[in-house]
Curated annotation (Swiss-Prot):
Part of the 30S ribosomal subunit. Forms a tight complex with proteins S10 and S14. GO terms for cellular component: cytosolic small ribosomal subunit. Residues 226-249 are annotated as: Disordered. PANTHER family: 30S/40S RIBOSOMAL PROTEIN S3, SMALL RIBOSOMAL SUBUNIT PROTEIN US3C. HAMAP family: Ribosomal_uS3_B. CDD domains: KH-II_30S_S3. Coiled coil: none annotated. It comes from Pelodictyon phaeoclathratiforme (strain DSM 5477 / BU-1). This is Small ribosomal subunit protein uS3. One of its GO terms (biological process) is translation. Gene3D superfamilies: 3.30.300.20, Ribosomal protein S3, C-terminal domain. Residues 39-109 form the KH type-2 domain. GO terms for molecular function: mRNA binding; rRNA binding; structural constituent of ribosome.
Amino acid sequence: MGQKVNPTGFRLGIIRDWASRWYDDSPVISEKIKQDHVIRTYVLARLKKERAGIARIIIERTTKHVKINIYAARPGAVVGRKGEEINNLSQELSRITGKEVKIDVVEVVKPEIEAQLIGDNIAYQLENRVSFRRAMKQAIQQAMRSGAEGVRIRCGGRLGGAEIARSEQYKEGKIPLHTIRANVDYASVTAHTIAGTIGIKVWVYKGEVLVQRIDAIEEDELKRIKERRNDAGARNRDSRTKRRHRTKR
């Protein structure tokens, strides 16, 4: 199952948090979800030319304002000179949302082990006619040197302008997809080349996290199972004693 499911969704609520951190039970919740998608698409498209290296965008909502946390490899490209770029971006997003927008830019310390940035970098190289094998191998080497415990990259499409589409992948280290406590970063990116689109999938294993929390959850679950078994055993004993009394009568 771990080989098929999205690694990020598989770990949500355990070791990974949601990208939209707000709650609403009103009928307009679908409009807010759609608005989050529009915000992310707009921010990525606007900062693509600057090559800011956007790893992820976290959106938080309150009744009065919308807070957007942008994780970027080059935060200076997002902020701009004297903060002009970020001020213009917040004003444009305020017109989209109809609320006050607050933007915080967080620097990504190790962009070499961020799956989204690795995929974007490979896509950029493929669109500029760099060999896909060279781009994949260089990305894996840089990630392993930067502290990743395992990397896997797969490219699929008309690789090298071939007539027949195929997929190739390179892997180094280990990628434990079935282990929920394993911090596996995943990204899927599309490169638009002259020959057609090429799909890029990236898995980066960064080690295990929150072992104590998972052990506590497992202990609680074991206690519940034991309590259920004890309750079931007590009910069975009561039913057997009642049957014996009936037979004696």
